[in-house]
Amino acid sequence: MTAFQPYSILITDDDPAARETLREIVAPQGYNTLMAESGEEAIDLISHHDVHLALMDMHLPKLSGLETIAIVRQIKGVIPAILITADQDDELMRRALSEHAFCVLAKPVSKHVVIYVVHKAIEKYYN
């Protein structure tokens, strides 16, 4: 399945290599990409651009991925968010669901899993 414009994905990670890896996974699928290195930058981009989905690292400087999702929800409503983290536990899963995260992916991410989950989130929210 190939994505059609104008779906835009915001990739937020404080690690430039991780951001670029995620961009290299989703951009060839036909998605526009925006990149942020912090929760604050992600909020600014979402406030000024049409963002259809967020791929967000859980551990960011200042605001966590979950805190960022909560603020975005107050500003724009629910935007499907896929959290990415190295430490999944039951409490994180509960908090992610309470903030309406679409899912939580474990690091290191699999290219095929990212593509599948992004497509499923876009289908669920926009089709």
Residue ranges and their predicted role:
Residues H49-L55, L60:
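Active-site beta3 strand of CheY-like receiver
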Residues E67, Q88-V104:
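Alpha4 helix (beta4-alpha4-beta5 surface) of REC/receiver domains from two-component response regulators
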Residues S38, S64-E67:
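Acidic catalytic/metal-coordinating carboxylates
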Residues P16-L34, E99:
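Two-component/phosphorelay signaling modules centered on CheY-like receiver
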Residues M35, L60-L63:
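Residue-level signal for the "D+5" position in two-component response regulator receiver
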Residues D44, L66-V78:
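Short amphipathic alpha-helix used as the core "switch/output" element in two-component signaling
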